[in-house]
Amino acid sequence: MEACPHIRYAFQNDKLLLQQASVGRLTLVNKTTILLRPMKTTTVDLGLYARPPEGHGLMLWGSTSRPVTSHVGIIDPGYTGELRLILQNQRRYNSTLRPSELKIHLAAFRYATPQMEEDKGPINHPQYPGDVGLDVSLPKDLALFPHQTVSVTLTVPPPSIPHHRPTIFGRSGLAMQGILVKPCRWRRGGVDVSLTNFSDQTVFLNKYRRFCQLVYLHKHHLTSFYSPHSDAGVIGPRSLFRWASCAFEEVPGLAMGDSGLSEALEGRQGRGFGSSGQ
């Protein structure tokens, strides 16, 4: 019988409660009030450090019934810094998350990376070696006005990998500027990538800029049937995200840089939020 992979983590935060660290998903809940101002990015320092098992990446997202949108972050194996959640206020006035109104989830997934000798259209090699996702660049210049949603159409079919599904995720660098990308499947006929500007400024993105990332999730992680080990709030109701069966192992030394893996994967370390550099 195959041993259950372990996610190593360290956590210490007086403002968050570790509600659950069961097989597959770790959940934190806010113990204090979080104020989100209109058209301003809010970051929540989690006091959480995590390392995925070999062959896995980590996914970080938030859920709430309040009018607040969370950036879905892809945590690369080489990232060694503190995890932080990026939130955007959907309203044009203050929103308040009272205690227990925000749940923060961390889960693992299996992935693969296609072998590309050269860049293929808008699909580029990642900035850091060992990153989970491929970089995807804009095919044209783009302007997003405050609270505007724009779709970018990509018609080039992505490289195929057996038993894996190409999926689009946003970048933390753009999310910090108020631009959130809605995760979605990239199918053979192309994909329409949806970007929303939650900031109070018009944001100009130049052609060829990295604006999202392409992650090849193992097909096991995408399902149309709900289960206690899946979440419809990550990718959407048509493709529920089902996390990998991993056990969480608390290793306090991770917060002090005792990562092991970080020594093997040089280059990223604490840069970015785990899903991109800034």
From Swiss-Prot:
Its cofactor is Mg(2+). Pfam families: dUTPase. Substrate binds at R171, S172, G173, F273, G274. The gene is DUT. GO terms for biological process: dUTP metabolic process. One of its GO terms (molecular function) is dUTP diphosphatase activity. It comes from Epstein-Barr virus (strain GD1) (HHV-4). Keywords: Hydrolase, Magnesium, Metal-binding, Nucleotide metabolism. Gene3D superfamilies: 2.70.40.10. It comes from the Viruses. It is an enzyme of class 3 (hydrolase). It catalyses: dUTP + H2O = dUMP + diphosphate + H(+). Involved in nucleotide metabolism: produces dUMP, the immediate precursor of thymidine nucleotides and decreases the intracellular concentration of dUTP to avoid uracil incorporation into viral DNA. Belongs to the dUTPase family. The keyword Transcription regulation does not apply. The lineage of its organism: Viruses, Duplodnaviria, Heunggongvirae, Peploviricota, Herviviricetes. InterPro entries: dUTPase-like, dUTPase-like_sf, dUTPase_trimeric, HSV_DUT. The keyword Hydrolase applies. This is Deoxyuridine 5'-triphosphate nucleotidohydrolase. Its EC number is 3.6.1.23.
